[in-house]
Amino acid sequence: GLFKTLIKGAGKMLGHVAKQFLGSQGQPES
């Protein structure tokens, strides 16, 4: 239970970070 929740949370966070990273590729860092 807890382990699965941690994995899910980590995946969500990684997805968010990846989105931010990919989104910043076409824009200059501010």
From Swiss-Prot:
Places the protein is found: Secreted
Transmembrane region(s): none
GO BP annotations, alphabetical order: defense response to bacterium; innate immune response; killing of cells of another organism
Highest rank taxon of the organism: Eukaryota
Keyword rRNA-binding: no
Tissue specificity field: Expressed by the skin glands.
Gene Ontology CC: extracellular region
Position of the signal peptide: none
Keywords: Amphibian defense peptide, Antibiotic, Antimicrobial, Cytolysis, Hemolysis, Immunity, Innate immunity, Secreted
Membership in a protein family: Belongs to the frog skin active peptide (FSAP) family. Dermaseptin subfamily.
Task of the protein: Antimicrobial peptide, active against the Gram-positive bacterium S.aureus, the Gram-negative bacteria E.coli and P.aeruginosa, and the yeasts C.albicans and P.brasiliensis. Has hemolytic activity (100% hemolysis at 128 ug/ml).
Protein known as: Dermaseptin-3
Record organism: Phyllomedusa tarsius (Brownbelly leaf frog)
